[in-house]
Amino acid sequence: MKTPENRRSWGSVFLIAFCLLLLPHAALAWPGLVIGISDGDTITVLRDGREQVKIRLYGIDCPEKRQAWGNRATQATKRLCVGKMVDVQEIDIDRYGRTVGIIMLPGGHTLQEMLVSEGMAWVWPKYCKLPVCREWSEAEAKAREGKIGLWQDVEPIPPWEWRWSGNQMKR
């Protein structure tokens, strides 16, 4: 016999299941092999040994290739992850169809944290909204104070400002 309590408990189960379905795919993480680098903040990861997925690094922005420190940022990204197995936490899809994600390196650090710590990237406040962004911002502050990487320059220009100051036309 169906009692009001049974209906409520089944209703709760369905409500919880429905809410879980609505969660963004940000909670999904998958392993893959880094097989390529487009620039400092875009990598290609081989998923399941067959699918190439272009990943835009969540929450940070590296200098553009034609910008000061751009080539060094690309080389740092290559050194840190090419040929390594990583875990990709999908956050979003950008307007170019790339997966936006957090890359967990072997050893437990994120690629984002490493690039920011080495002074090869800025935390991008407009897009970095997750709790981990606070840690990355602290790492950026330490790199800035220590004049590490791009912070050696007197006034480094964030890539988002550089792109929209007319330099994107020179690419």
Go through each PLM region and give its residues.
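Small beta-barrel nucleic-acid-binding modules, primarily SNase/OB-fold domains
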Residues: 2-15, 19-171
